[in-house]
From Swiss-Prot:
There is a cross-link at K210, K213 (Glycyl lysine isopeptide (Lys-Gly) (interchain with G-Cter in SUMO2)). Keywords: Cytoplasm, Isopeptide bond, Nucleus, Phosphoprotein, Repressor, Transcription, Transcription regulation, Ubl conjugation. Residues 166-183 have a biased composition (Basic and acidic residues). GO terms for biological process: positive regulation of cell population proliferation; regulation of DNA-templated transcription. Coiled coil: none annotated. Its main location: cytoplasm. The lineage of its organism: Eukaryota, Metazoa, Chordata, Craniata, Vertebrata. It comes from Rattus norvegicus (Rat). Phosphorylation increases its interaction with PSIP1. This is Cell division cycle-associated 7-like protein. The modification Phosphoserine is found at S21, S76, S100, S103, S113, S135, S136, S183, S185, S249. Plays a role in transcriptional regulation as a repressor that inhibits monoamine oxidase A (MAOA) activity and gene expression by binding to the promoter. Plays an important oncogenic role in mediating the full transforming effect of MYC in medulloblastoma cells. Involved in apoptotic signaling pathways; May act downstream of P38-kinase and BCL-2, but upstream of CASP3/caspase-3 as well as CCND1/cyclin D1 and E2F1.
Length: 438
């Protein structure tokens, strides 16, 4: 039985199993199904072929004889296929089988999806099942060899790709202005909303200010309608604020005393502390006691000489005469080296007068050039060169503030401009004219 079945295998079929297939791919094995469901499996296979359009599942070697062999059921599942013998390979010279294979090879698609072919296959299947008495393989293989489709790499310079790129660029360029327009419109909407909010806030503020002003005016009107509730205080007049000026009395004048100043430096200010040694102190005491015993208990008294500013005409030098101040601008102030003027009490370094009276001395007889000319109408140069010249205080005509206060009169102040206005050359003549009028 096994030999009978093997004798039916042609050489071309054996070549299919023995020859290596480089251009064909093995899809897989088909499960064992009974003959009753074979037609249904073939229908499902056809539908699957229609779904997979890109894969070509037909082969030129898939003949009718090969289909019949694989559709037959095996008698025993334990038998294995061990290969083809030489006799089976030589038997393939049967002309009938060769013609059937050639006729089947001319067909491009042996597994057609037409209804007529399906009916023929369903009728031939039970006939082959009855006639076959051999034991076939335990495995049935469905040879479906899809043709390889080489994946064509797209050319970068192809017109289709270039056209697609240009289309994409155009779309992007169209989208960008649209996005800009959308963003600009959004920004305009936001700015309008903000301006609307600010305008609403300003209007609300103006309304509140107006209401507050109206309320304040109403309250002030109500307060003014009740004058007794809030009495209005009249400010005191300026005449009441002024204290009456004390009239100058002709009575006794108190002596002028310098006020006590808290800023006055303490006693012994800026004095150096000289330390004496004990030996020197004992020597001084010893010498003092010795002089006392020698003199008979009486200490020697030295005669005190009063330093006077009296200077003769011969002592006046030409430099001192040139140093006389004619105007106020010629006076140079110096609190260390300068001497004080009796009239203006300013300490300057210019040359001043010297009183020739023996009982006068110090600041009393010193007058600067502007004061002596404006107040008394005299010149410092002639006073220095006159050996008999005496100062105004010694003559009793001094009109300074201290001398007038001592005599019970008030200070005159600056009267030179008023005296010149009335035609007088100095203040002394103007005061004498006033005294005559009284």
């Amino acid at each position: 039985m096994e030999l009978a079945t093997r004798s039916q295998i042609p050489k071309e079929v054996a070549d299919i199993f023995n020859a290596p297939s480089d251009d064909e791919e093995f899809v897989g094995f088909q499960d064992d199904v009974p003959m009753e469901n074979l037609s249904e499996s073939c229908g499902s296979l056809d539908s699957l072929e229609l779904e997979k359009q890109n894969a070509c599942l037909h082969s030129k070697y898939f003949t009718e004889e090969l289909r019949r062999i694989f559709k037959e059921d095996t008698d025993s599942d334990n038998e294995d296929f061990e290969g083809f013998t030489e006799s089976e390979l030589n038997i393939g010279s049967n002309p009938e089988l060769i013609e059937s294979e050639l006729s089947d090879g001319d067909k491009t698609h042996p597994m057609m999806s037409d209804e007529e072919d399906d009916d023929d296959e369903e009728e031939a299947a039970p006939r082959r099942g009855r006639q076959s008495t051999r034991s076939s393989f335990g495995l049935r293989v469905a040879f479906q060899f899809p043709t390889k489709k080489t994946a064509k790499t797209p050319d970068k310079n192809s017109p289709h790709l270039l056209g697609g790129k240009t289309d994409l660029r155009r779309e992007k360029s169209c989208r960008q202005p649209k996005e800009k327009e959308d963003s600009a419109s959004d920004a305009e909407d936001e700015s309008r909303a903000e301006s609307q909010e600010t305008s609403d806030a300003l209007l609300k503020r103006a309304m509140n200010i107006k209401e507050n002003k109206a309320m304040l005016a109403q309250l002030l009107a109500e307060l003014n309608s009740v004058p007794d509730f809030f009495p209005v205080r009249t400010p005191p007049s300026a005449s009441r604020r002024r204290t009456p000026r004390r009239a100058f009395s002709e009575g006794q004048i108190t002596r002028r005393v310098n006020p006590t100043r808290s800023a006055r430096p303490p006693e012994k200010f800026a004095l150096e502390n000289f330390t004496f040694s004990a030996t020197k102190l004992t020597e001084e005491l010893y010498s003092f006691r010795r002089r006392k015993t020698i003199s008979g208990g009486k200490c020697q008294k030295y005669r005190r000489h009063r330093i006077s500013s009296f200077r003769s005409v011969k002592d006046i030098t030409e430099e001192e005469l040139e140093n006389i101040a004619i105007t106020v601008r010629d006076k140079v102030y110096d609190k260390v080296l300068g001497n004080t003027c009796h009239q203006c009490r300013q300490k300057t370094i210019d040359t001043k007068t010297v009183c020739r009276n023996q009982g006068c001395g110090g600041v009393r007889g010193q007058f600067c050039g502007p004061c002596l000319r404006n107040r008394y109408g005299e010149d410092v140069r002639t006073a220095l060169l006159d050996p008999k010249w005496t100062c105004p205080p010694c003559r009793g005509i001094c009109n300074c503030s201290y001398c007038r206060r001592r005599d019970g009169r008030c200070a005159t102040g600056i009267l030179i401009h008023l005296a010149k206005f009335y035609g007088y050359d100095n203040v002394k003549e103007y005061l004498e004219s006033l005294q005559k009028q009284l």
